[in-house]
Amino acid sequence: MEPLTEQKPAQIRPRGKNHVLAAFLLGVIAGAAAMFCTGFLYLRHNLIVSYEFPGLTAAEFDDAFENAMPAESGWKSSREACSLPLPSDGRALYNWKLCNRTYARGLMDDPDHGLVLPALVPCTVSVTNAPDGSAVVSRLNTSLLGVIYGGNARRVLRSGIAPEQEALISLLADGIRKEKAQRKENEP
């Protein structure tokens, strides 16, 4: 039997500063890329909000925007001339401007973004029919835009415009439903 000899442990060579710096930079780049992709996907799916109203049609909403906007709300509606082509399947597409001068003034008076926010005054509401025939109302997600811009724009967009536009759209839908129910009752 051979005597046991003592073996020297393998020498561990410390890595140089270049390896640590390269790993750090790679981590920063990978993190930034992941953050950018996540932000892009989040905005893509959340920048437009849509409400579907089964039993109601886009044409009924079009009439409601034209005839039933409550004057005391401070909101004005006007049909938006749009050069967009109709959907290829022939569905109706209506575009409306739904604006409130008080909120528009609040955006224009923003000390940080007042010169550019008037271009973004989020007024356009689009109405079309889903494949099943129900009305789909879409608009910019003003709450999200408020978070992105911050400051006075956040207050105006998130706390003012967003909840009031949602309430007005729901009010129009309720009015259409009531009108349809009354017509049905009056039919012989």
Model-derived segments and spans:
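Generic structural motif
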Residues: L56, R101-Y103, A130, T142
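C-terminal partner/receptor-binding element of secreted or periplasmic proteins
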Residues: T142-P188
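N-terminal signal-anchor/signal peptide hydrophobic helix marking the start
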Residues: L21-L26
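Ser/Thr-rich, low-complexity intrinsically disordered terminal regions
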Residues: L47, D63-S126, G151, S159-P163
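Flexible, solvent-exposed short loops/turns enriched in glycine
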Residues: V116-L120, T124-V156
